[in-house]
Every structure is written in structure tokens, then in C-alpha cells.
């Protein structure tokens, strides 16, 4: 049966001689149209298939499209009666496999292989696809560049480099110059002319006049933004004052405050509009104060409430603008911009050096990566040379049409490359996409390219260009399309998202489901009220999951009908029809565990935290102790693993043999005893030494495989739950080790640190979970992974969790396609503070809007995956003194003229903030239904319903142990014993186990871990901490890592600077009596390879010298043998000593740690601990007090350990605050 196309689809298929942009909404059949256009051009226009260039976003999409075209050609061939036409079709079928229907990377590779001589590269290159190898080459290139600058004889060049790194040295968010250079690389490689783009980074900081108001940055970016913001505020204020009858006594008392604020606001706006000097504008904005209190008045309560909102909005706007753009005077702004120009120029210079060195290393190895392919192809097609002319002419004459799928996801470089393939004056470009589904900003996709063409091609006078909109949705049921339109009508506008959704983006229901079928007719907002819910992070709690599991169980129990396109009939929904979409995969492991607990089958599409999986934690710990066995935490992790099976009591017994030495030393001492446990210790130590010897003469990959073989660890993990996946994970680590070695790296320690960096940078090496495990299971995936897919029933989960975009707009820099914003330390009034440049303030705002726009588009993708039923799940946190009705009232008021204002959208902190106003408004206006989960039934009327989940009444059902017992009445004796044990375990899991708290922590704790869990210490004990808080610090659930990263890498964070400072003070030689030897001590550590040159150059040597020259340290020179530094200790404590709400448990917890230093005076011990925490000089006394409270519990642990060791009593405890040069006593 012939397909019936809509008029717009027919135009897209049949139009010729024009550049076409097809804006195809979700589920609108764009792929079918693209395939049909190709077939028509072959059949009707007699184009050869190899005369078409079809660019897709993924290899899977390219393969699918090629297969569809091939199938259609085969169908036409079977029907064809004309011999010549049949021959033509056979030829096209023969050529389809070599036709360029591919990703843009594959096409670029074709360009390079065909015209490599145009840019003089070796044709015998290979493609570097392994992320590990790419990261290794980047590391090497960056290290070479850094060393080159540090050793450069050109002092000016060296100074520029050091100034760049110094600008980021004190960043508390660990954003370093290295981070900037690596981030710059990603942005630069997505630009058509990256050298020119980098060289323009300093442009916004360069002023040609004496007032920042005259700069291009102010006039083109900042001023329009401020005018818009204050215009909106003035409109609100004017409307409010017009509403008030100030002649009436009830309103009269409010008039002076409003009039004064309106007058001062008008003065500032006029000053802004007429470009008054910066300092004058600053003065007028500071005068915009809203004085007076708006007291509640029942007679005019609505006015007072609205007035309060306008007042708060005005105060907040004035505060934000003043502290952002006007925080410093014109003179200081000029100085900041001048320094910013120097840093930006240095960043561009060093970045270009890094790119050149990275390219040199790749060329030396005769390899290219993906970014090379696009850059080199662009270079081939754009150079002013005869060879480039030849390349352009070849492709421009070959391709009669250029088709680009998912055009909204292209970047500037890809778009520039595509434009070079067009012949001047020839309109043969066909682009299809949907800007509402542009969700790959992190890959440098630029939706602005689509929006610009959308606007241009939509104009009546756009000769040779045409815009076509696909609005019909053939995927989703009417309740789904109605809900999507309801939400996005208020969200996507020209000033937020680049498209007017109400006018041009709405979905038109066209799915054609049988109206007689009893299908689900409602989209659900599934919620529970929770005054204790947290929305501060992305972690899902059990309440969220119980709510979703309960709803899934009811869908299955009710046999909710869905339409099955394979049979053309309705059938009951199954688990396999359901998908759960989340913003990130952070909670995947927790979700899987909870679904398993309730017996609901779940297939996880991808699991984060590869390096945190049990098997990788054990093996990486083993590698660490092979490199250096004197590391307590990895050593204990290996001993407790299934390889050796040492119990907590075994470990405690070993530790007690000598509490003052490392665990490795205690283990060796204990092994000399004549006990069964000692024999096991000897076996372990023998194997460890054997592997250490083996590692000296063998490759890392060989070492790994030898561990697997000698320990049978592959077999052990294969026997565990999800064993095949665990085995694949271990195999993947072996393969990465081989790749690491093939790149020229051999050292085990460096490999351990490389893996640590991969984990830190979230470079996950995990293999995909085996697909055959999916079966009839609920599918869990991220929204990104769901793009292009569809499911009968979709749950969108985690709507109350905060976005984490703050990490992109805080710190020392903000980076965007439009430029680089910088923040750095600058001296103000004889004190140094971190200050934002104007460019940084502006880019924070611009980038925040881009990020929020992408989050809104991500929601659009999520909601449009649903075919027949959409369920939005949220755990709603109720503000203090507010019930749900009050919260709904607040949400509904945010909708103005059917839309959220830009100001409100810029305040959004979580997905629910985007959705709730429209949903609440719809509930008010349309009086939509409110139901409980238990009241839901199938086939109900309506398009949107709010479903309240009551945890007490609607709790998800756990597997029924009694039913299991009944079904096992005829079990054999052995089977009955197994069942009895399983039932006991089930009882324990439901709270029957008497020592449940003990299972949530370990019998072996590091002070550093306990310190992270402690809040402020209570007066008479260590801390008022809760056992539940320690779950996040449980070493068997979290990555094990004790090695400081700085030893063999150049990435420098505040924490690493602190650790390095400790290292210097540990090895400083007081015995020589030289108080000026800090420099020589640091030089010695660098020479021995214990400290990198880069980090050494960033240490605060003045602070270190201050301490060793202080009166506090004078005794260290006189009797250095009484000084103890980096002293290991261990002590046994009752759990209740550490955790306030720990249940009664007879066992103990072994706590270990390292004391920075103590000095044995005549009558007792002086204990001290170095701290490098930043201390605000303006609030130094308050900051020091907070530090004392913060570290009091830690020092008391050290005191207790020393007192129990039989040494002299601890007399005093001190914090050595290096950043502010203070030594303070702690009670």
C-alpha cells in the first residue's frame, strides 16, 4: 500500500532547485521522508546513488538509512518492467554499499585519503579511536609544552606562561590552567579556523578608550542585556503602581517608597541609555534602594503580596547587577581587563603550542584522531592552492545533492565544511532536523546555526531557500501530544530556545490509534509530598523508586492495554514495554538494586562508575600494593576481597600486634607467629613478593593477566551476580593496559595514576552491559541514550533533582564558543581578592541561558519518547509553612500571558521548575483530575491527571515469601535447607538483622573518611555523626585511592598543593640547622621524582619558610630527634564513640590515620597539624574559629591515639594555618 504523505512532507520530497531546511518535530517521520526523497531522485531524476552525499549523526543511523534505501530499491526492481530502468536500478544496488551515506567523520576520512597530498601528510596513517591512547598523547603533549616553557631561555615567554598558571593556582574548585588548556582544545577543534578563534580570545579585554562603557563588550553585549532586564522590571513596577489607588488611605502609605524607587530606577536607566560614564552609572544604580516594609493588610492582601514580589525582584536585580557588573570602579575594571588580556593572550599562545605538539606526536606515530579528520578535511577544501581547488571541484561536481540529517547537532566546523561542498550559485543543500531536540552542547553542537537558517529560510524574499515545518506527530497518543504542547507552549520562545513553540513548534496529533480501543487516555503527573525530600543533588532516594515501582506493578496487575503494531491488536502491557528515563546515570546502580529487591526485572542500558565496581576496586588496589605495599587502605581491600577472605576480626588481630606502624609492617610481624592466621599471612606475603618481582621484568598487561591466573579472580567474579559483565570489565582493564604500553609508557606507578586521572575526568572504560540480558524487562537509560527511540510507556524520573550547571559557570574561567571569561586574584585596598572581569560576568549569564535552554530541550526529548502513556514522576519538597495547594498557587502565578518570563526561566534550578508552572496552571484553569494510585483504573477520560502517591497506602509490593513457601511445599530436604537460609536472609533484609548499622560501615576506618562524615564535633566527644551518613564513605561502595596524584602528573588542585606542602615539611631537614633551606628541600624532592616541577613552582614557599623560621619550630632545630612527622597510628573504638545513633553492637571499629607531626617536650607531647585551607583576611578571626571547630574532632582522635600508645601525655594541640601564617591552639 502506497504511503500517504502530508502536504508538507510531499513538498520536502518533491521540491528541487532550492536549499531546503526541514524543521521536523519529534515523531514526524523525517527519516521516511529523507529516504523517499533519495528514492525519487534516483527514480525520477535519474541521479546515481554515488552522486548523493548523505550525512547522518551516528553510524547506526547511516547503516539504517542505507538499509532502507537498499530495500526500497530492491522493491522497485521487482516491480520494474522496463529493461533499461531495471539495469539502472541494479547498478544503484551494486553501488549502494560504497555510496557516501555516512557520518561526517567517515566522509572527512574519505576526503583525507583521496587528497592527502593537498596538505602534505603521510597517506599511510591509521585512525586512533582508543580514548585511552588519545588521553595519553594529550598528557605527553601538555607535559612537553610545560617543560618547554619552564626551561625556555626567553624570560618574557617563560613569565607569560608562569603568569597563566599562577592565575589559577588558588582556585578552590580545582580548575587549573591545565583544565583550561584541555577545555580550550575541545572548543578550538570545533571551530573552522581555530588559530584565529584562539587569537581573538583577548579581544573583549582590550580597551581603546578610558571608559569601559565605550568598549565593544559593553555596547554589544552588556548594555542590551541590562536594558532588557531593567525594562522588564520597570514594566512590572509601572503596572503595579497603576493598579494601586494611592489617593486611597489604604494605599497611600506605600506611595513614597514606590515613587522613590521608580524615580531612582528611571535615573539609572537614562544614564545607561545615554552612555554616561561607568562610575556615574555605578553611583546611580547604588542609589536604587527600596526602603520601607510592606506589612500584610487583609483588605488589600493581593496588592501587598504582588508588591512584595515586585520589591524582591527589584532588590535582587539591583543587587545582582551591581555585584556583577558594577562591583569595581572604572579604574579597577580597566586594570582587571588589562590583566585579563594578558592571561587570555597567554592562554591562546600556550594552547597553540599544545595543539602543535599534540599534532607532532600524532604525526610521528602516523595516527589521526576524530578531531583531526574534520580539521584536515576542512583545510583540504579551503586552502588557496591548486590541490585544494582540485579537491573542491571534485566534490562539487560529484555531488548533485548534499543531505544533512540531524542538522541541529552540527558545529561551526562541520557546517563550514558542508558549505564548502556547495558550488557557488547552486542550491542543492537539503537539511533536516529539530532544534527542539538539540541536546549535544557538550559536543560543541551549536543550535544557533539551525536557528539562523530557520529564520533566514522562512522569509518571503529568501530566493533559492525554503523552510518546511513538519508538525504532525505519528508516534504519540493524543494525551501525550497535549501534555507536551501544554508544557512547551510556556517554555520555548524566541528569546529562550530560539523558536516560538506556540506559533511554530506545536505537535499535531496524527498517530491514528484506534479510537474504539480502550487505550490509556491520560498522561500522569505521579507525585508524593515530602517535606524532608532533598533536591540538592542527583541521588534518587528510596521514596522516589518505591513510587515508580508501585505504579509499574499496578500497570502490570491491571493488565493495562496497549496497542501492538506487530499484531495490529491491543494486548496487556508487559515490563518490556516500559522505559524509565533519567537525566544522568549516577543512580543506576541504586535503582537496579531497588528494582531487584522488589522483584521487578530491570535492564540497565549503561552503568556509571566503572572504576567503582567491586572487581576493578580490588584489582587496582592489588596493583597499588604491588607497586608499594606500605599503603594501608588498598592492602586491607585486597586482604578482605574474595581472593584472600581475611575477616574484620582477622584484620583487627593483625593490627593489634603493633598499632604504631603501617598495616604492612604489622602484617609482616604477625606472620612470624605460629597460628593458622599467621600461615595465611605468610602465604599472602609470599604471593605479593612474587608478583612484585614479576612486575620488575614484565609488562603491566602481563602482570594483570598473571594476577587473574594466580588468584582465579576471573572465575571468582564470573560466579557472582552479573558475572559475565564483571569478567568483561576486567578484560577491558587488561586491554587498556596493553594500549597504555603501546603508547610508550611502561611504569606501573604512572599507570596507576593514569587510571586515577581517567576516573577523575570521568573517562569511563566500562563495556556495555550484555544486551541479551534485556529480555522482558523495564529499560532504564539516560535521556541522551533514548534519543531516536520510542516506547509504549515512559516514566521520566528525578524531576526534583537540581541541575549541576554551576560547575560550568563558576571557578576561574567560563568558556563558550563566543569567548573566554576570566576570574583571578587581584589586589584591592592592599588585600588580594578573586575578582570577575566584565567578560566573565557576561559569559556566566550567556552560558547559563544556553545550558538551561539545552535542559529544556532535553525534557522535550524525554517527553516525546512516549507512544501511548507518559508518566512524570516527582518527589515534591514542600517549603516551610507551605502545603501543596499553596505551592501550586505559586507555580501557577509564574505563567504570564500563557508563558514563563525569561527572568523566571533563568531562575530554574531543576526540571520540575520548568514543568510545574504549566501543569499547575492547567490544573487551575481546566480543573484537571486528582487521583490516588490505588484509585487508578484503565480507560478513564481526560488527557492529564495528577496522581498522588501515598507511601502508607500505595507502597510497592515486595516478593511474597509466604507464596514462595507454599509453592515449595514438595521441596527435597536439601532444597528445603536452601530455602530456609534464603528466608532467613530475606528476614534480615527487612530489618530482622540485629546489627544492620554495622553492615553499613566497615571494621576498618581511616580518619580522613571519618572526618568527611563528621559535622561539627560535639563538646564531650569526637562528633555528632549518624551511621547513615557514613554509607557514602563506605570504602567498599566507593573508589579506593590514597595516592596523591601530583607525584607524576602536572594537574594541580588546591588539595594537591596542600599535600605537596605537607610533603615538603615532612622532609625538611631541621638537623642541618638551616632555616633557609626550603628551596633546596623542594629541589631535592623534584630531583628524586617525588614532586613535579610544575607543582614545585606553585608552592607557597614564603608560607613554608615562615613556619620553619617560627618560634614554634625553634625546638625542632635543637633536638630534631624528638620531632616525629607523618606518624602512622591505629586505635580501636566503639562504634557509639563515632556515631551517635549506632545500634548496640558488641564489635569494635579499627581507626587508622597519619599524624602530621608532634614534638616530645620534657613533660608531654605538643601535637600539631598543617592546614592549607584558605582564610578570608577580612573575616580572619571568624574563619579561624570555624577551622578550629572543623578539625577539632580529628585532633582529638590523634590525641587519643597518642595517649593510648604509652607515650607521654598530649599537653597541647595546634593547627598550623599556612595560608594566613597563624598557629592556633585547639581545645
UniProtKB/Swiss-Prot annotation:
Keyword hit for Membrane: no
Q: Start and end of every UvrD-like helicase ATP-binding domain?
A: 3-477
CC cofactor: Mg(2+)
- Which positions bind ATP? 24-31
User: What GO terms in the biological process aspect are recorded for it?
Assistant: double-strand break repair via homologous recombination
The task this protein performs is described as: The heterodimer acts as both an ATP-dependent DNA helicase and an ATP-dependent, dual-direction single-stranded exonuclease. Recognizes the chi site generating a DNA molecule suitable for the initiation of homologous recombination. The AddA nuclease domain is required for chi fragment generation; this subunit has the helicase and 3' -> 5' nuclease activities.
Pull one GO CC term from this UniProt entry: cytosol
| Top-rank taxon, per record | Bacteria
| InterPro entries for the chain | AddA (IPR014152), DNA_helicase_UvrD-like_C (IPR014017), DNA_helicase_UvrD/REP (IPR000212), P-loop_NTPase (IPR027417), PDDEXK-like_dom_sf (IPR011604), PDDEXK_AddAB-type (IPR038726), Restrct_endonuc-II-like (IPR011335), UvrD-like_ATP-bd (IPR014016)
The Swiss-Prot or TrEMBL record annotates one GO molecular function as:
ATP hydrolysis activity
**Pfam families for this protein:** PDDEXK_1, UvrD-helicase, UvrD_C
| Matches recorded under CDD domains | DEXQc_UvrD
Task: Provide this UniProt record's keywords sorted from A to Z.
Answer: ATP-binding, DNA damage, DNA repair, DNA-binding, Exonuclease, Helicase, Hydrolase, Isomerase, Nuclease, Nucleotide-binding
The entry assigns this protein to a family as follows: Belongs to the helicase family. AddA subfamily.
Q: Give residue ranges for domain UvrD-like helicase C-terminal.
A: 505-788
What is the recorded name of this protein? ATP-dependent helicase/nuclease subunit A
Instruction: Look up keyword Isomerase and say if it applies.
Output: yes
Q: How does it assemble?
A: Heterodimer of AddA and AddB/RexB.
Q: Quickly give the catalysed reaction.
A: Couples ATP hydrolysis with the unwinding of duplex DNA by translocating in the 3'-5' direction; ATP + H2O = ADP + phosphate + H(+)
UniProt-listed PANTHER family? ATP-DEPENDENT HELICASE_NUCLEASE SUBUNIT A (PTHR11070:SF48), UVRD / RECB / PCRA DNA HELICASE FAMILY MEMBER (PTHR11070)
Q: What is its EC number?
A: 3.1.-.-, 5.6.2.4
Q: Taxonomic lineage per UniProt?
A: Bacteria, Bacillati, Bacillota, Bacilli, Lactobacillales
Amino acid at each position: 500500500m502506497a504511503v500517504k504523505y502530508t502536504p508538507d512532507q510531499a513538498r520536502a520530497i518533491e521540491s528541487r532547485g532550492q536549499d531546503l531546511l526541514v524543521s521536523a518535530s519529534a515523531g514526524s517521520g523525517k527519516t521516511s521522508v529523507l529516504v523517499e526523497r533519495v528514492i525519487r531522485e534516483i527514480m525520477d531524476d535519474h541521479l546515481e546513488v554515488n552522486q548523493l552525499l548523505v550525512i547522518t549523526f551516528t553510524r547506526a543511523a547511516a547503516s539504517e538509512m542505507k538499509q532502507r534505501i537498499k530495500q526500497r530499491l530492491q522493491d522497485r526492481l521487482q516491480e520494474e518492467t522496463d529493461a533499461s530502468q531495471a539495469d539502472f536500478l541494479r547498478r544503484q544496488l551494486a553501488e549502494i554499499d560504497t555510496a557516501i551515506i555516512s557520518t561526517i567523520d567517515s566522509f572527512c576520512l574519505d576526503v583525507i585519503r583521496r587528497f592527502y597530498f593537498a596538505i602534505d601528510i603521510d597517506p599511510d596513517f591509521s585512525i586512533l579511536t582508543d580514548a585511552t591512547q588519545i588521553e595519553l598523547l594529550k598528557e605527553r603533549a601538555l607535559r612537553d609544552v610545560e617543560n618547554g616553557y619552564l626551561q625556555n631561555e626567553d624570560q618574557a615567554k617563560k613569565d607569560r606562561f608562569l603568569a597563566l598558571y599562577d592565575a589559577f593556582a588558588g582556585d578552590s574548585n580545582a580548575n587549573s590552567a591545565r583544565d583550561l588548556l584541555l577545555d580550550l582544545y575541545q572548543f578550538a577543534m570545533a571551530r573552522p579556523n581555530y588559530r584565529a578563534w584562539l587569537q581573538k580570545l583577548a579581544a573583549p579585554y582590550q580597551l581603546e578608550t578610558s571608559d569601559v562603557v565605550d568598549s565593544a563588550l559593553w555596547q554589544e553585549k552588556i548594555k542590551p542585556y541590562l536594558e532588557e532586564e531593567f525594562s522588564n522590571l520597570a514594566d512590572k513596577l509601572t503596572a503595579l503602581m497603576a493598579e494601586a489607588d494611592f489617593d486611597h488611605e489604604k494605599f497611600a502609605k506605600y506611595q513614597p517608597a514606590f515613587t522613590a524607587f521608580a524615580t531612582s530606577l528611571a535615573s539609572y536607566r537614562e544614564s545607561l541609555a545615554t552612555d554616561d560614564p561607568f562610575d556615574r552609572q555605578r553611583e546611580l544604580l547604588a542609589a536604587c534602594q527600596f526602603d520601607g516594609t510592606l506589612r500584610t493588610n487583609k483588605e488589600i492582601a493581593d496588592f501587598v503580596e504582588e508588591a512584595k514580589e515586585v520589591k524582591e525582584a527589584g532588590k535582587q536585580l539591583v543587587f545582582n547587577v551591581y555585584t556583577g557588573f558594577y562591583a569595581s570602579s572604572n579604574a579597577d575594571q580597566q586594570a582587571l581587563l588589562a590583566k585579563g588580556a594578558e592571561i587570555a593572550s597567554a592562554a591562546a599562545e600556550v594552547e597553540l603550542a599544545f595543539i602543535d605538539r599534540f599534532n607532532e606526536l600524532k604525526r610521528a606515530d602516523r595516527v589521526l584522531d576524530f578531531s583531526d579528520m574534520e580539521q584536515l578535511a576542512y583545510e583540504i577544501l579551503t586552502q588557496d592552492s591548486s590541490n585544494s581547488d582540485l579537491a573542491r571541484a571534485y566534490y562539487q561536481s560529484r555531488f548533485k545533492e548534499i543531505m544533512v540529517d540531524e542538522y541541529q547537532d552540527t558545529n561551526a566546523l562541520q557546517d563550514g565544511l558542508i558549505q564548502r561542498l556547495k558550488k557557488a550559485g547552486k542550491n542543492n543543500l537539503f537539511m533536516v532536523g529539530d532544534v527542539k531536540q538539540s541536546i549535544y552542547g557538550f559536543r560543541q553542537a551549536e543550535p544557533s546555526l539551525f536557528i539562523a537558517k530557520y529564520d533566514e529560510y522562512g522569509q518571503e524574499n529568501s530566493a533559492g531557500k525554503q523552510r518546511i515545518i513538519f508538525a504532525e506527530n505519528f508516534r504519540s497518543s493524543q494525551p501525550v501530544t497535549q501534555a507536551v504542547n501544554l508544557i512547551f507552549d510556556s517554555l520555548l520562545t524566541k528569546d529562550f530556545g530560539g523558536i516560538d513553540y506556540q506559533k511554530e513548534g506545536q505537535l499535531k496529533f496524527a498517530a491514528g490509534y484506534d479510537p474504539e480501543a480502550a487505550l490509556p487516555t491520560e498522561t500522569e503527573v505521579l507525585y508524593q509530598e515530602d517535606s524532608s525530600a532533598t533536591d540538592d543533588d542527583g541521588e534518587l532516594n528510596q521514596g522516589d523508586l518505591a513510587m515508580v515501582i508501585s505504579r509499574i506493578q499496578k500497570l502490570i496487575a491491571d493488565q493495562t492495554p496497549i496497542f501492538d503494531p506487530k499484531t495490529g491488536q491491543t494486548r496487556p502491557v508487559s515490563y518490556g514495554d516500559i522505559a524509565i528515563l533519567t537525566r544522568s546515570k549516577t543512580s543506576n546502580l541504586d535503582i537496579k538494586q531497588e528494582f531487584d529487591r522488589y522483584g521487578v526485572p530491570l535492564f540497565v542500558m549503561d552503568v556509571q562508575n566503572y572504576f567503582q565496581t567491586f572487581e576493578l576496586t580490588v584489582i587496582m588496589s592489588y596493583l597499588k600494593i604491588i607497586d608499594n605495599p606500605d599503603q594501608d587502605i588498598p592492602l586491607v581491600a585486597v586482604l578482605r576481597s574474595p581472593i584472600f577472605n581475611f575477616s574484620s576480626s582477622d584484620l583487627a588481630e593483625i593490627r593489634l600486634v603493633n598499632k604504631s606502624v603501617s598495616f604492612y609492617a604489622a602484617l609482616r610481624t604477625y606472620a612470624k607467629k605460629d597460628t593458622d592466621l599467621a600461615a595465611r599471612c605468610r602465604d599472602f606475603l609470599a604471593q605479593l613478593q612474587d608478583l612484585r618481582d614479576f612486575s620488575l621484568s614484565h609488562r603491566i598487561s602481563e602482570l594483570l593477566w598473571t594476577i587473574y591466573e594466580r588468584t582465579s579472580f576471573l572465575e571468582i567474579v564470573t560466579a557472582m551476580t552479573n558475572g559475565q559483565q564483571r569478567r568483561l570489565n576486567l578484560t577491558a582493564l587488561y586491554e587498556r593496559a596493553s594500549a597504555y604500553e603501546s603508547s610508550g609508557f611502561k611504569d606501573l606507578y604512572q599507570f596507576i595514576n593514569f587510571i586515577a586521572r581517567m576516573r577523575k575526568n570521568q573517562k569511563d572504560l566500562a563495556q556495555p552491559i550484555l544486551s541479551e540480558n534485556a529480555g522482558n524487562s523495564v529499560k532504564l537509560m539516560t535521556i541522551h541514550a533514548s534519543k531516536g527511540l520510542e516506547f509504549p510507556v515512559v516514566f521520566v524520573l528525578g524531576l526534583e533533582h537540581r541541575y549541576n550547571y554551576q560547575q560550568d559557570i563558576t571557578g576561574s574561567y567560563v568558556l563558550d564558543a563566543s569567548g573566554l571569561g576570566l576570574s583571578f586574584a587581584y589586589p584591592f585596598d592592599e588585600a588580594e581578592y578573586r575578582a570577575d572581569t566584565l567578560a566573565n560576568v557576561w559569559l556566566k549569564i550567556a552560558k547559563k541561558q544556553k545550558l538551561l535552554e539545552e535542559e529544556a530541550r532535553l525534557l522535550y526529548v524525554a517527553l516525546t519518547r512516549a507512544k501511548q502513556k507518559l508518566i512524570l514522576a516527582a518527589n515534591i519538597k514542600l517549603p516551610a509553612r507551605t502545603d501543596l495547594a499553596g505551592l501550586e498557587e505559586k507555580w501557577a502565578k509564574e505563567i504570564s500571558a500563557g508563558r514563563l518570563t525569561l527572568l523566571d526561566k533563568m531562575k530554574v534550578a531543576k526540571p520540575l521548575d520548568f514543568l510545574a508552572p504549566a501543569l499547575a496552571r492547567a490544573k487551575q484553569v481546566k480543573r484537571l483530575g486528582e487521583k490516588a494510585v490505588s484509585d487508578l483504573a484503565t480507560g478513564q477520560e481526560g488527557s492529564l491527571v495528577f496522581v498522588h502517591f501515598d507511601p502508607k497506602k500505595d507502597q510497592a509490593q515486595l516478593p511474597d515469601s509466604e507464596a514462595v513457601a507454599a509453592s515449595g511445599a514438595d521441596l527435597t530436604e536439601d532444597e528445603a535447607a536452601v530455602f530456609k537460609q534464603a528466608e532467613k536472609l530475606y528476614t534480615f533484609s527487612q530489618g530482622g538483622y540485629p546489627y544492620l548499622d554495622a553492615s553499613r560501615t566497615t571494621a576498618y576506618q581511616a580518619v580522613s573518611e571519618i572526618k568527611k562524615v563528621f559535622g561539627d564535633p560535639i563538646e564531650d566527644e569526637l562528633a555528632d555523626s549518624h551511621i547513615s551518613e557514613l554509607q557514602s564513605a563506605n570504602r567498599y561502595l566507593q573508589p579506593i585511592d590514597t595516592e596523591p596524584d601530583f607525584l607524576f602528573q602536572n594537574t594541580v588542585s588546591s588539595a594537591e598543593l596542600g599535600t605537596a606542602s605537607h610533603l615538603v615539611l615532612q622532609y625538611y631537614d631541621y638537623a642541618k640547622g638551616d632555616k633557609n633551606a626550603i628551596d633546596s628541600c623542594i629541589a631535592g624532592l623534584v630531583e628524586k621524582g617525588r614532586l613535579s616541577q610544575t607543582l614545585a613552582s606553585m608552592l607557597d614557599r614564603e608560607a613554608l619558610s615562615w613556619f620553619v623560621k617560627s618560634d614554634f619550630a625553634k625546638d625542632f632545630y635543637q633536638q630534631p630527634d624528638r620531632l616525629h612527622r607523618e606518624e602512622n597510628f591505629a586505635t580501636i573504638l566503639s562504634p557509639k564513640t563515632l556515631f551517635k545513633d549506632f545500634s548496640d553492637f558488641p564489635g569494635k571499629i579499627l581507626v587508622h590515620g597519619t599524624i602530621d607531626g608532634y614534638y616530645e617536650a620534657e613533660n608531654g607531647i605538643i601535637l600539631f597539624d598543617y592546614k592549607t585551607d584558605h582564610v578570608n583576611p577580612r573575616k580572619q578571626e571568624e574563619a579561624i574559629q570555624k577551622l578550629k571547630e572543623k578539625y577539632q574532632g580529628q585532633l582529638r582522635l590523634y590525641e587519643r591515639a597518642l595517649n593510648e600508645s604509652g607515650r607521654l601525655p598530649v599537653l597541647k594541640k595546634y593547627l598550623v594555618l599556612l595560608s594566613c601564617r597563624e598557629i592556633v591552639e585547639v581545645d
